[in-house]
């Protein structure tokens, strides 16, 4: 049996994805009832951060500790993948001392190359092209609040970035319609649209995408590494803010999500996080539970391989 990794949502079957989402909610209930569950005592998670993140570090580190394991944090100062030592060599050495690895970096090819030479499961904590762990949390959150997302309509408002790419994959796997509203020149990459165009519809304005939506999602206008484009992007995205007026075009029970951190007054209105249908705080917490379910799945699959 081949070693299992989680670099994109498509590394799972739809059945496996649904199983992980169900398990995430089970683990959440166990924690809320103060039930101690430590199946991975002695297991060590390596966390390689070339892009910093509060939520990613806390959720993974807390998750493996709650499982009875431990985590090692490696910052850009500790390891620079591909700079000084080939990624392939780093993967061989690092994975020989750990049980599972999470990488948050820039180029998606970095996690692919690392995984190719790793002896243990590798999780993509975020790359420029994909953010699959966030999709686990988003899907879990929607299901907890509204039930199955199959057949529903999701509106993505803003940049055709890594989050948007992962939503495109999720639409294909989970059977929902995805309406993407982006300024010209900021649409998702053609290769993602070419493969999953059957479940995606593009719009050049936010209002048309929001009509009858069951879920509206957005992200920052300028992601990490795009700070020099901030002013240019503010101008391009000025008409793509998610606010109360836009939510009024959607279904009355439409949920709102944002992976955070959010910039009030830019991609969202000043009060959007307090909207009655905003579930961003549940969404943020569910990173912990969804990633615990993912780690449990990957570690157990690796034990089967052994």
From Swiss-Prot:
Its EC number is 2.1.3.3. GO terms for molecular function: amino acid binding; ornithine carbamoyltransferase activity. PROSITE patterns: CARBAMOYLTRANSFERASE. GO terms for biological process: arginine biosynthetic process via ornithine; arginine catabolic process to ornithine; citrulline biosynthetic process. It is found in: Cytoplasm. Carbamoyl phosphate binds at residues 53-56, 80, 104, 131-134, 259-260, 287. The keyword Transferase applies. Keywords: Arginine metabolism, Cytoplasm, Transferase. One of its GO terms (cellular component) is cytoplasm. Pathway: Amino-acid degradation; L-arginine degradation via ADI pathway; carbamoyl phosphate from L-arginine: step 2/2. InterPro entries: Asp/Orn_carbamoyltranf_P-bd, Asp/Orn_carbamoylTrfase, Asp/Orn_carbamoylTrfase_sf, Asp_carbamoyltransf_Asp/Orn-bd, Orn/put_carbamltrans, OTCase_ArgI. It catalyses: carbamoyl phosphate + L-ornithine = L-citrulline + phosphate + H(+). It holds the Pfam family OTCace. L-ornithine binds at residues 162, 219, 223-224. SUPFAM superfamilies: Aspartate/ornithine carbamoyltransferase (SSF53671). The keyword Lyase does not apply. Reversibly catalyzes the transfer of the carbamoyl group from carbamoyl phosphate (CP) to the N(epsilon) atom of ornithine (ORN) to produce L-citrulline. HAMAP family: OTCase. Belongs to the aspartate/ornithine carbamoyltransferase superfamily. OTCase family. This is Ornithine carbamoyltransferase. The gene is arcB.
């Amino acid at each position: 049996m081949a070693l299992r990794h989680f670099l994109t949502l498509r590394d799972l079957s739809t059945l496996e994805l649904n199983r992980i989402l169900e398990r995430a909610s089970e683990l959440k209930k166990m924690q809320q009832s103060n039930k101690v569950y430590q199946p991975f005592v002695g297991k060590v998670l390596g966390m390689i951060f070339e892009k910093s993140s509060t939520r990613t570090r806390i959720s993974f580190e807390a998750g493996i500790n709650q499982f009875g394991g431990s985590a090692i944090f490696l910052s850009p100062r500790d390891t620079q993948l591909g700079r000084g030592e080939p990624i392939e060599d780093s993967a061989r050495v690092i994975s020989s001392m750990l049980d599972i690895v999470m990488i948050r970096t820039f180029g998606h090819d970095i996690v692919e190359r690392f995984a190719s030479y790793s002896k243990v499961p590798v999780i993509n904590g975020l790359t420029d092209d994909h953010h699959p762990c966030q999709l686990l949390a988003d899907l879990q959150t929607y299901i907890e609040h509204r039930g199955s997302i199959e057949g529903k309509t999701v509106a993505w408002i803003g940049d055709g970035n890594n989050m948007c790419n992962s939503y495109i994959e999720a639409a294909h796997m989970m059977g929902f319609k995805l309406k993407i509203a982006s300024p010209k020149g900021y649409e998702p990459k053609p290769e993602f649209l070419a493969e999953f165009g059957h479940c995606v519809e593009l719009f050049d304005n936010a209002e048309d995408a929001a009509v009858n939506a069951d879920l509206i999602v957005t992200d920052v206008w300028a992601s990490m590494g795009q700070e020099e484009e901030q002013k240019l992007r503010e101008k391009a995205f000025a008409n793509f803010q998610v606010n109360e007026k836009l939510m009024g075009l959607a279904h009355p029970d439409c949920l709102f999500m944002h992976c955070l951190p959010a910039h009030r007054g830019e991609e969202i209105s000043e009060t959007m996080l307090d909207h009655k249908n905003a579930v961003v705080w549940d969404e943020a917490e569910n990173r912990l539970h969804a990633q615990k379910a993912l780690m449990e799945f990957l570690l157990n699959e690796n034990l089967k391989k052994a």
